[in-house]
C-alpha cells in the first residue's frame, strides 16, 4: 500500500531497524529475508534522501534524520495496531493475551502475585512478562513496548494516564539481635549505622526511601547495595545493619525471617503505588480490563 509515494510497509521495516539496530535481527522480527530487508533500507534511503543508518562495528547507527522519524513512525504503527487491527472486546476466559509489565520485585511479591492467582482462575490463557525496573520506563511506554508500569507515582511522568493502587509506608528494620534497635531510634543513630539499600536499573537509580531521604538533605552510610528490595531482609540477619523498606514487605518476610521493626526517626511520608499505561492504549479493551483487575485487587490489600 502506498501513501503519497511511500510504501507503508517500509515504515514497519524502519521501526524494526530502529529497535534492533542489526539487519538480520530486524529482518527476523518482521519475517523478512535479509536481502528483502536490505532492499527496504535502500528504498527508504531513496524516499527520505538520507542514509538513515550507518554501519559501525556491525551495528546500524541511525542518522539524525532516522532518529527524528522514529517516534512518529512508532506512534503511527501503534495507532493502526490498536485502533484498526487489534481492537476487539476481550473475553477473559478465552483470551491468550500476554501483558508486559515493569514493576519492582517488592510489588511482584506483595501485590502482583494476587493478580496471577486470580487470573489463573478467571483467564487461564492470559500470561505475563514481568520486567525489572528500567532506566527510561517513559520511553518504553511511549513506544508501546510495555503494557503497564507499576511504581511509586512520584517517579511517573505526566505524559501517560495512571491510576492509584494503594498507600505504602516506610519503616526501619533490622535483626532482632541488633542491640541498637532496643528502643526509639534517634536520627543520629540512624545516620551513624550501616545501611543496606536497594538501587534499580543499569544506572542504579535510587529507590523510593533514598529519594525521600534526599529531600531532607540526608545521606546515609550505605554499606551494601542490592538490586531490589526482596534481598534486603535475608541480608540483615546476624548483622548490625539496618534498612528502610516498605512495611508490607516486612510483614511478608517476618513469617520466615526474624526482623525488628522500628519507627523511622524522620517523618517520612507514605507514598502511593500507582499503575501507568501508554496513552495510546487508553481505549484498548484488554488494557482497560487488566487495569480494572489491578485496581480491584489493590483495593482489597489496601483495606
Curated annotation (Swiss-Prot):
InterPro entries: LysR-type_TF, LysR_subst-bd, NodD_PBP2, Tscrpt_reg_HTH_LysR, WH-like_DNA-bd_sf, WH_DNA-bd_sf
Protein biosynthesis among keywords: no
An MF annotation (GO) of this entry: DNA-binding transcription factor activity
Record-annotated HTH lysR-type domain positions: 6-63
Coiled coil residues, start to end: none
Top-level taxon of origin: Bacteria
Pfam families the UniProt entry points to: HTH_1 (PF00126), LysR_substrate (PF03466)
Regions recorded as binding DNA: 23-42
The protein, known as: Nodulation protein D
Family listed: Belongs to the LysR transcriptional regulatory family.
PANTHER family per the UniProt record, alphabetical: HTH-TYPE TRANSCRIPTIONAL REGULATOR LEUO, HTH-TYPE TRANSCRIPTIONAL REGULATOR LEUO-RELATED
Organism: Rhizobium leguminosarum bv. viciae
